[in-house]
Amino acid sequence: MCRLSMPDAIVPFAKVSGLTSFAALAQVRRLLGVKKVGHTGTLDRFADGLLLLLVGGFTKLAPVMTRLEKSYEARIQFGVQTDTLDPEGAVVRCSLFPTFARVRAALPHFTGSIDQVPPEYSALKFGGVRASDRVRRGEAVCMKARRVFVFDLQVLGCEADLGEFKKTQAGRGAAIADLDLTRVRAVTLYVRCSAGFYVRALARDIAAACGSCAYVSHLRRTRIGPFDLAQAAGVSRLGSWTWGKERASCGAACFDVGAPPPPSSGGVATDSVSFGCEDLTVREIKQAVVSCDVDFANRIGLTACSVHAQYASRFLHGERIRACWFQSFGTRRPGERALVFSEGRCLGLIRKAANGFSYDAVFCTE
């Protein structure tokens, strides 16, 4: 009998800053003693936050899970641009800080459906080789614009130059009218976007629209589809965000600008130290496992269908799928995917074809 266990699991996992996504997978793989562990979207090494791990047979869900929308909190540092658009790159350009009014005016142009040119330092492949690897070898790459979607874009806070912003006005509750003509060193944004979106490219483009330049100094992924960072194994190991205290001594006034907090579990981490997951236990990971049930299917936008118990064995052995096997299927549009269940077990993923059904994946065997 097949049961959902660690060899077949979906695990929200909190990656720390300073650790690559691949290294995080390797540590979890060793900890669990399993060979197959994947994830649904790379996080840059400097970033922290939510990775959705797929363990064992559920790695076959990757094509579905990678399409889920994602949410981030990011600190955009103005006045400096690095070649990688993150803190790990070399400085290639400097400029004046933009006014807060120009930043606010630029944001509406980056919501909804937009064309975005990915950063040259990215995991996108050209001829089977990552663009970032080609650039580091001195090769030229031509990044083409891609259509992406931004569902929500909010300013959560900003850091103004005290030389232009009176100390008596600094702090929580400062009026936006007081800030508009003030030059800002950095802003913190909440972004909810489609798959394939690059926050580093957003920082580059917002700064350009403001007549400045920028890079992303801190980045945290707070949500993937219906999964929140607060549910993740190891979330307590992430650093807390203390940007106001840390930068008050650097000549910056730090304050909120009235935006309501987004539905996420924390702010941007300031630590870039890798804590690893050596002290993370199998028990913590198991406690974070997401049940693959009908509710899960609905939450990730899939149809759930139920197979009669007497046909489960035929399904698991890959026999041609027949409509009479199903107790229920819901709508049957061509191309629609569905998770298949029988007596509480998730058996696999199928797709409706014009002349029947086809297998996308079988997750377990008898």
UniProtKB/Swiss-Prot annotation:
EC identifiers of the protein: 5.4.99.25
SUPFAM superfamilies for the chain: Pseudouridine synthase (SSF55120)
Disulphide bridges, residue numbers: none
BP-aspect Gene Ontology terms: mRNA pseudouridine synthesis; tRNA pseudouridine synthesis
Keywords: Isomerase, tRNA processing
Active site: D44
Keyword tRNA processing recorded: yes
Pfam families in UniProt: TruB_C_2 (PF16198), TruB_N (PF01509)
GO molecular function: RNA binding; tRNA pseudouridine(55) synthase activity
Top EC class for this record: isomerase
Catalytic activity field: uridine(55) in tRNA = pseudouridine(55) in tRNA
InterPro entries (UniProt xref): PsdUridine_synth_cat_dom_sf, PsdUridine_synth_N, tRNA_psdUridine_synth_TruB, TruB_C
Purpose: Responsible for synthesis of pseudouridine from uracil-55 in the psi GC loop of transfer RNAs.
Family: Belongs to the pseudouridine synthase TruB family. Type 1 subfamily.
UniProt cross-references to HAMAP family, sorted A to Z: TruB_bact
The name this protein goes by in its record: tRNA pseudouridine synthase B
Gene behind the chain: truB
